[in-house]
Amino acid sequence: MGTDFVEFILLPSLMATLATEAPNVQILFVSPDRRNLEAMLANSELDLVIGYLPEPPKELIRRTLFHEPFVCVARRGHPVLQDESLSLEHFVELPHVQVLLRDAAMYGDAIDTAIAAIGLVRRVVLWQPNFLAVGNVVSRTDLISTVPSRVAAHFVQELPIVAYDPPLALPAPDFAMYWHSRSQEDAGHKWLRGKIAVLLKP
């Protein structure tokens, strides 16, 4: 289980690794309701959860994989953003597209909490369920977005998009891997966890 961001940075290298080292292993990537993660791991409906969980179930075993800073993105030639930096004024005034994951409690909350701490509110006009679709919207409109840095790097490489440092301090979420204690000593599970940890190392 993981977001499309995790799919984007993990699946190509993971599948290449499995093709040579474990060709009989099959992967099913799903995005279940976060409220059911503990039960799904306990019932073997899921083997692993990978992502950013602000309040993970205490019964799960956790391994931090990496910290991912946020980056702001806008289309090249944006009529307002002519400078090399993004001002706080423009950040809160320009319309945003925000990723809204299944239970609405992940990335957007972290960003909006940081903005609220300095007494401001940004203007979100579009919510989307995944990160990679954001690039097409940003590249064709005057909307801006705040996304994980590796997503932003992909946008800049593939689309007419410019990346900016955020004009305020934003938390860098901890992306981690979670699993149930029943899988802790399983040899195959340990092998897969080790491979994923190496592949996701920044």
Task: Name each region found by the language model.
Residues 1-58, 128:
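Central regulatory/effector-binding core of bacterial HTH transcription factors
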Residues 9-10, 161-202:
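A late-sequence structural motif
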Residues 25, 41-50, 70, 120, ...:
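Alpha-to-beta junction loops
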Residues 52, 80-82, 86, 96-118, ...:
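Secondary-structure junction motif
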Residues 53-54, 76, 148-151:
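Short secondary-structure boundary segments
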Residues 58-64, 68, 129-181:
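Beta-alpha-beta core module
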Residues 60-96, 180, 189:
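Flexible hinge/capping segments at coil-to-helix
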